[in-house]
């Protein structure tokens, strides 16, 4: 990736993005539930001054937040956009969705959220709703509806940026430009280095400097006449802590679907 070819057009706050989901056009969530890290995709190119700033198919991450007070509503809140590399933070919100439907909680296993696939008409002329919940498809009988859900049309949902975006590439994945090599004159004395190596820059300052004594020998000279062995220890490695909200009303999902 050439850094000179990266579009860094500022995307101002107030810009509207239209998002979509590939597999499902309907999304249902219970009030007072939250679905985190849901994947959506930009439905149309976003142009700033005639230049495409956000191309169609760009993946975004967002949280669906549903509340029951002061009114029953759900909102999509974007947290990340993947323009380059590992993505960057974003702040954008959708309009409130207040469309309500009801289901039989026993038929859907009291799922906090679900996706509707399509309607089914039986030979007797009875319509059934088919939903996908907990990795299973179910045909609902529509009897004894006792659970309220918020219905969101995810075929096209718009969000508005709360702050400016400046596309930032992932510089860690870019190749480092190599400077042209400069020929040097051979050293007369091959036993002495031509120049001293640069010292390691250490920005770390110990918390208790008055008791700190570095355990090294500045004037140490290795004895090349003896055998040296390196020993490593794995005691310094530990697992990273995992996030756990402790709230059963928060869920996360990831769909491995390419736009």
From Swiss-Prot:
Q: Name one GO cellular component term.
A: virion component
Q: Where is this region: Disordered?
A: 171-259
| Alphabetical keyword list | Virion
Its principal location? virion
Q: Where is the composition biased (Polar residues)?
A: 179-201, 212-236
Q: Specify the superkingdom.
A: Viruses
Which compartments does it reside in?
Virion
Composition-biased stretches, type Basic residues, lie in 202-211
Full protein name? Uncharacterized protein L591
């Amino acid at each position: 990736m050439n850094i000179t070819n990266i579009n860094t057009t500022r995307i101002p706050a107030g810009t509207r993005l239209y998002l979509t989901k590939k597999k499902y056009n309907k999304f249902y969530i219970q009030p007072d539930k939250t679905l985190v890290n849901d994947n959506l995709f930009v439905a149309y190119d976003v142009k700033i001054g005639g230049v495409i700033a956000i191309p169609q198919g760009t993946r975004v991450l967002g949280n669906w937040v549903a509340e029951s007070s002061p009114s029953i509503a759900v909102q999509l809140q974007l947290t990340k956009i993947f323009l380059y590399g590992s993505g960057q933070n974003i702040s954008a919100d959708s309009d409130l969705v207040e469309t309500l439907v009801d289901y039989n909680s026993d038929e859907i296993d009291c799922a906090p959220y679900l996706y509707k696939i399509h309607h089914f008409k039986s030979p007797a002329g009875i319509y059934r709703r088919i939903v996908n919940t907990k990795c299973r498809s179910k045909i609902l009988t529509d009897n004894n509806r006792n659970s309220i859900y918020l219905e969101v049309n995810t075929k096209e949902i718009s969000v508005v940026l709360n702050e400016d975006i400046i596309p930032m590439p992932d510089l860690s994945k870019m190749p480092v430009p190599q400077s042209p090599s400069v020929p040097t004159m051979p050293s007369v004395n091959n036993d002495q280095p031509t120049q001293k190596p640069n010292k390691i820059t250490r920005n770390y300052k110990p918390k208790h400097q008055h008791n700190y004594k570095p355990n090294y020998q500045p004037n140490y000279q290795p004895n090349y006449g003896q055998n040296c062995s390196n020993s490593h220890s794995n005691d310094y490695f530990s697992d990273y802590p995992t996030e756990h909200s402790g709230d059963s009303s928060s869920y996360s999902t990831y769909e491995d679907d390419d736009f």
